[in-house]
Amino acid sequence: GSVTNDSAEYGIIRMVVSDPQRALEALSKEGFICRDTDVLGVELDDNPGALDRLLVSLLDSNINVDYLYLSFNRSSGMPIMILHVDCINEVKNCLQAKGHCVL
């Protein structure tokens, strides 16, 4: 999955890839400025209210999210919410305890 963001000065493309090191090398070789950032993937049920349940879990646990975007699991077709948070392991444990499928 990928998401873009741009301004007058620069653009940002966020990508989830299977081989981050290879992607960094390929993009850097072409002159792109790259940064590897850890994110958390949470598989959502494909039904109304699934995103709300995830967001309520984050809110109830007082978890701040820097950014999020939606992707999908190519094998299952299920939606995956990609989250950037400060403490990935803590958030992972918290969401798993609340019944969310953390990837």
Positions of the model-derived regions?
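A conserved regulatory-domain signal marking ACT and ACT-like small-molecule sensing domains
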Residues: 1-103
